[in-house]
Design a protein with these regions (language model features):
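PRPP-associated nucleotide enzymes
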Residues: 5-143, 147-227
Length: 227
């Protein structure tokens, strides 16, 4: 196995490492049923969207080996891509545990960003201490449209800090998210993605190759897909 220290100190070709990581993590997510694919029996998301695809990265917290894998790989990516980082910020609530684990690994300060300020006490939006001028890397568990993730970025910037980038466990790869991150000038890196998960699901026989067309049609226009 490639260790955190080894990957950070060698001249491995980054693209090869990332492609391998995407496949490995996709397989791990499918194994623990953190990702479910139901082309003929779609889920309903909180947004009201119908979807044949559901990802729950919080399940990884219940498996020590997988939890450690996520911590090490996100930590490695931050150490490689954002060595200037002064602090780690987790997006509430899904990325709070992952972000805290990564911050501990890298020996960096940790904060988390709420979706809205508390309605009592200090009414904080950011919990923890960030000093103006700090360079912050945001940790997220999942990227769909990118809206909530980029609100966290905005809150950190409004605190006088610089957001170096964001590392997420998974992305659906929606065009709307790519456009939003580009407009906000935020570099996004993920452990795995839609393409890697679907390819692995077909390889292990979790879905039929014929299901891929349904999944791809949904991904093109998720807001209007009805199954």
């Amino acid at each position: 196995a490639l260790t955190f220290h080894y990957l950070c100190s060698t001249n491995y070709k980054l693209r090869t490492v990332m492609e391998t990581l995407e496949k490995i993590f996709a397989a791990k997510l499918l194994k623990v049923k953190a990702i479910k694919l139901q082309p003929t029996n779609p889920f309903t998301w909180a947004s009201g969207w119908k979807s044949p695809f559901y990802c729950d990265n919080r399940k990884t917290l219940s498996y020590p080996e997988l939890r450690n894998f996520v911590k090490i790989e996100i930590g490695r990516l931050i150490a490689e891509r954002f060595p200037e980082a002064d602090a780690i910020a987790g997006v509430a609530t899904g990325a709070i545990p992952q972000g805290a684990l990564v911050a501990d690994l890298l020996n960096l300060p940790f904060v988390y960003v709420r979706s809205k300020p508390k309605d009592h006490g200090l009414e904080n939006l950011i919990e923890g201490e960030l000093r103006p001028g700090m360079k912050v890397v945001v940790v997220e568990d999942l990227i769909s449209t990118g809206g909530s993730s980029l609100k966290a970025v905005e809150a950190i910037r409004n605190n006088g800090c610089e957001v170096s980038g964001m590392v997420a466990a998974y992305t659906y790869g929606f065009d709307v998210a790519a456009q939003a991150f580009k407009a906000a000038n935020v570099k996004l890196i993920t452990l795995t993605n839609y393409e890697a998960v679907v390819a692995e699901a077909v390889r292990i026989g979790y879905i039929d190759p014929s299901d891929v067309e349904v999944l791809n049609e949904w991904r093109k226009d998720p807001a209007h897909w009805n199954g």
